């Protein structure tokens, strides 16, 4: 609907509904939109209740309520922003009018429809409709009354004189009747002949245009009173007289008293239109309801703003949580890879006792996780921990036994060496051999003691490291010990004579 602008929409609505809208904001009353729905779906909207002359917001809201009811009946899923349309927002009214044009082009069947006749039939005309109606009635009404001429006013009198009233006995009268003969029938008419007597003539009759001319006949004498041009022409009917007295024709219409009004006199042939403007103030109840609805709308807007702020905060927190989760997953993968490498290394060198301890520590985590799941599982985890502690104690005891056995073997070897060194050799002198043997024995004892002390210190240091260090430090210490052992195995003695003797003995 981007091709339709404001002027095109206004021209389309004015031509279709025969209105005179000047701005697109006038569609905010909702009346024209309701009649568009009546054109597309006749009888599906309560058009009789729509106010085409609405001027206040609460009247606009009522019109839009009828529009929403019709949408609900027809199943039209269109959200109507009543608050924006009622405030005469140009963009909102233009967008809704464009949607109505699209809906009209899609569902209108092409049946003939006269918008003015429809509004007049439902008694909801606009101001333009009323003015056009008044113009039509003035054009198609009774023909305008022209000012009567004196000849036309005297014409019925002559006709009345030409037809004398029938009498039973012919009588003759004088040529000049007295004025009393004329005034008496007017002042005191007979009850049988006149339905309502006229006691006093109206001011319009008091000054006739022409003087009454008596007419003489052989049978009877009749006098006629001509009416002035300003009075309407009465229809005179002759009254039969039983006597030979002169008779006066009486009008058949009932004279009505003239009401004195401050309006200027009406000129014949002209039409006067009176327009009454009634300014009615809206009832207080509706105003209170409108104010209450405005308050509720403001409160709902505040709540929506608060909810929007809360939603923004939650989205920001969720984004931060996602970032932290990604960082944690990276750290987890990093440390898991390192632990896996350590596990593989320990499995490859499982003959080393320290690495066996490391493997036990690595495999001990499953029992702890299972122990956290329930009370029964906690008990099983405690039992496993006790078994592991017992196993560790057994391993320590075995290591201590091995150390004791090694010490005993070393002591036995030392004693054996001492015995072998204490025996004299036959090829050497008795004086020189004991001195050399004593020196060698002293050096061997010092060397053995120093070596035993170093082994004990290393053993205790290893135990302390295993108990107080983490996995990485344990791995580093194991690798360092292995390198130290390799250095010891690859080391050689010096080229001294004493060292060569010891080497031969070993």
From Swiss-Prot:
Annotated EB1 C-terminal domain residues: 303-371
Main location: other
A matching Pfam family: EB1
Every Calponin-homology (CH) domain range: 3-105
SUPFAM superfamilies membership: Calponin-homology domain, CH-domain (SSF47576), EB1 dimerisation domain-like (SSF140612)
Origin: domain of life: Eukaryota
Keyword match Nuclease: no
Alphabetical keyword list: Cell cycle, Cell division, Cell projection, Centromere, Chromosome, Coiled coil, Cytoplasm, Cytoskeleton, Kinetochore, Microtubule, Mitosis
UniProt xrefs under Gene3D superfamilies: 1.20.5.1430, Calponin-like domain
GO MF terms, alphabetically ordered: dynein complex binding; identical protein binding; microtubule binding; microtubule plus-end binding
Function recorded in the entry: Involved in microtubule polymerization, and spindle function by stabilizing microtubules and anchoring them at centrosomes.
Places the protein is found: Cell projection; Cytoplasm, Cytoskeleton, Microtubule organizing center, Centrosome; Cytoplasm; Chromosome, Centromere, Kinetochore
Positions with biased composition (Low complexity): 134-228, 251-261
Subunit architecture: Interacts with mtaA/CP224 at the microtubule tip, centrosome and kinetochore.
Acidic residues bias locations: 367-403, 410-428, 453-474, 483-506
Recorded phenotype for the gene knockout or disruption: Defects in cytokinesis due to poor mitotic spindle assembly during mitotic prometaphase.
GO cellular component, one term: microtubule organizing center
Coiled-coil positions: 283-344, 377-459
Family, as annotated: Belongs to the MAPRE family.
The protein's name in its UniProt record: Microtubule-associated protein RP/EB family member 1
UniProt region (Disordered), positions on chain: 127-268, 365-506
Single Gene Ontology BP annotation: spindle assembly
